[in-house]
């Protein structure tokens, strides 16, 4: 599955996981959205129903700082926008924070959800904390894997209810 990176050059170059994916030939740099655009502001959620699109046209990650990106910037990118369901960062900067994944964690999660588990594990192996991310989210990733959008939304709702203690 092709992975594309749009790099806004707002991250610390030493910590930029998108550039690492490009350097190690796991992703290709692009200036335009292709296929599925991972967008944290999207109302639609990535699911197995998106696999055909991802196989044909790829997945695009916008590599930028969480502190300097707005919804408007994502809206300008053409493609099929999808967000990831609740997952917890395994990276040292945002460890344990829901939804605040690095670019490489977003790629790993996307591949896992789309049932490309071997490729997800292969990419997790290129960073020290890749397996931390997988272990931290193992149960969630397995529950999202191969599921429809509605099924994932229901699982996510249940997880959030457990976290905030609502019935």
From Swiss-Prot:
Pfam families, per database record: Fer4_RLI, Ribo_biogen_C
Record localization: Cytoplasm
InterPro entries in UniProt: RNaseL-inhib-like_metal-bd_dom, Tsr3-like, Tsr3_C
Annotated EC: 2.5.1.157
Entry GO CC: cytoplasm
Domain of life: Archaea
Keyword S-adenosyl-L-methionine: yes
UniProt-annotated binding residues for S-adenosyl-L-methionine: 17, 62, 84, 99, 103
Reactions that this protein is recorded to catalyse: an N(1)-methylpseudouridine in rRNA + S-adenosyl-L-methionine = N(1)-methyl-N(3)-[(3S)-3-amino-3-carboxypropyl]pseudouridine in rRNA + S-methyl-5'-thioadenosine + H(+)
Alphabetically ordered keywords of this record: Cytoplasm, Ribosome biogenesis, rRNA processing, S-adenosyl-L-methionine, Transferase
Example GO molecular function: 18S rRNA aminocarboxypropyltransferase activity
GO biological process annotation, one example: enzyme-directed rRNA pseudouridine synthesis
EC top class named in words: transferase
Function: Aminocarboxypropyltransferase that catalyzes the aminocarboxypropyl transfer on pseudouridine corresponding to position 914 in M.jannaschii 16S rRNA. It constitutes the last step in biosynthesis of the hypermodified N1-methyl-N3-(3-amino-3-carboxypropyl) pseudouridine (m1acp3-Psi).
Similarity comment: Belongs to the TDD superfamily. TSR3 family.
Record's protein name: 16S rRNA aminocarboxypropyltransferase
